[in-house]
């Protein structure tokens, strides 16, 4: 327990690079002490029983782009919303969703409900000639995606901070055509209407991939794909991450994701 448990939690969640770990001992007493613990340093011993572990958010260091793998980047490389750390498409799911998109050499990719931008930005690292439209309605989302793009040295064609359904009801940003690939990660209660709007614009041989959390969402959206004449595939993505214990390692389950894929003939 204690400080060691906090550190294990950070490591297993991929957030160790996003926080400084401070230890406060005997706070308010004459012998109080505050210490910053480097990520690669062992915890000091002995620690006082009256102990507080404090996590202070920090911006991850700028990655060396040449040292990064081609895809499957660690979650901690991305800047994230400070009030929702860890709220992003995790590495294991990101790899599978990129595979499901079957990215072409060239074309237009829409990332709707882009979050931190992780999937669309990794797609640009794999296929630099793609034109990416990233849409995120959350306040500050566009600035976050642009900052992550700069860190990874890729350039989206457009990053828009708005509701995706409202955007598709109007004219597209300049320089962007209809999509060849769509990742539909947002929509909320309007997901059904959003999918209908996407299908109206999807090019022939285009692919739409929809990560979902519930069977009810699949039951609602799958018929729309089938009625529109798309070839439909459904997969469940499930992964576990090793989490260190005092005497070994346990496998901590990650949230399962249902990947609904439609391919236009």
Language model regions located:
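Conserved class I S-adenosyl-L-methionine
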Residues: 106-115
